[in-house]
Design a protein with these regions (language model features):
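Conserved acid/base catalytic micro-environments in cytosolic active-site loops
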Residues: 1-308, 313-316
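Surface-exposed acidic, glycine-flexible loop patches that form ligand/cofactor-binding
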Residues: 19, 328-332
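Conserved class I S-adenosyl-L-methionine
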Residues: 332-340
Length: 340
């Protein structure tokens, strides 16, 4: 995993605040480099054409040569495969590929395109896209890291998991070049490590769970696929949520009942997706009967934040209200101020 000092530099496309996505289907972000085209061919050969998902492929392409990757992939799938060179709305059952010398980002339900910065010292195109995917599509994003050299994709994949999405890495012994998958796995944030031929079925299972899952309403959790309308089911869900937090406190010693509700729901929803469970009562039963699940849920609850100053309102209040007072205090002229 990257150290904090190696945080991903802001790209031109990231200077604007990412708007949440309005899309009601999963967006699958796929990062690949050396050996990645062969892995992509196997993935799309095994992916049904009418799967209801969208795929965005970010590869390390030479900025000095045209790429025919989209034409090669089109030979193994009936989904529409497009190489992106201009802003493009994302549609289901489509595959979008990065163009040479370009950077892809996601904003709302669109792909944005900017010219790649030639001064950028290392490949981070996958990280940058996956971070915007996470911020835009949140718990309905999936990040996949395939064959490649280096570590691009590891930080972006971690961000997807932080925002409630699901993460997958190609099994290293199945990858032609295993550095990128191994780097992703080393973050501890990968949900599934699979041979590339098994990834399509996993995606189908995840999408099936997403569109049937039911959770209590919360204004800050994007749930376009399902909602609980029945009052009795809503009460049962709220009771199950309380029981889940009680179980977690009993087994881990950590009490999350005062945590932000949206964060708690997002973390539990992620575990429900991973375990293919459709509602909170089902997850409560799974948690009761699966002792090791408490450890996984706790890890999700305590997942590290991958952005500095992530809570914008809190830091703006700190800048506006607190810091000026510290330096305006009479004793501040002779008293050191420590920042860490």
């Amino acid at each position: 995993a990257r150290a904090m000092s190696e945080e991903i530099p802001a790209a031109e496309g990231l200077k604007l605040k990412v708007q949440p996505s309005h899309l009601n289907f999963p967006v699958i972000g796929i990062g690949a480099s050396a050996g990645g085209l062969a892995a992509l061919l196997r993935l799309f050969e095994n992916m049904p054409n009418d799967n209801g998902m969208a795929f965005v492929v970010v590869m390390h392409l030479s900025p000095h040569h045209e790429s025919s990757a989209h034409e090669i992939l089109q030979k193994v799938t009936k989904m529409k495969v497009r190489q992106i060179s201009e802003p493009t709305p994302i549609e289901r059952n489509c595959v979008y590929l990065i163009s040479p010398a370009m950077q892809l980002t996601m904003n709302d339900g669109y792909l944005r395109v900017t010219e790649l910065n030639p001064a950028q010292p290392r490949h981070i195109a996958i990280d940058i896209f996956m971070r915007t995917l996470a911020d835009a599509h949140a718990e309905h994003a999936v990040a996949i890291v395939l064959s490649g050299s280096g570590s691009d994709g590891s930080a972006g994949l971690s961000r997807v998991k932080e925002q409630g999405g699901v993460t997958i890495a190609q099994a290293p012994d199945d990858a032609e070049y295993d550095e990128m998958p191994r780097s992703a796995i080393a973050t501890g944030q990968v949900d599934f490590i699979l041979p590339v031929g098994d990834i399509p079925q996993k995606l189908i299972d995840l999408w099936q769970t997403m569109r049937t899952m039911q959770l209590p309403a919360d204004a800050e959790v994007a749930t376009p696929f399902r909602s609980i309308d029945d009052p009795e089911q809503s009460r049962a869900a709220e009771t199950a949520l309380k029981d889940i937090l009680t179980l977690l406190r009993t087994r881990s010693g950590h009490d999350f009942k005062h945590y932000k509700r949206a964060t708690v729901l997002r973390r539990i929803e992620r575990r429900m997706q991973v375990n293919r469970l459709g509602d909170l009562p089902a997850y409560r039963a799974f948690l009761q009967n699966t002792p090791e699940e408490a450890r996984h849920l706790l890890a999700d609850m305590l997942i590290g934040v991958t952005n500095f100053f992530r809570d914008r309102e809190a830091f703006e209040a700190l800048e506006r209200e607190i810091i000026p007072r510290v330096f305006d205090m009479p004793e501040s002229a002779d008293t050191p101020v420590r920042v860490w």
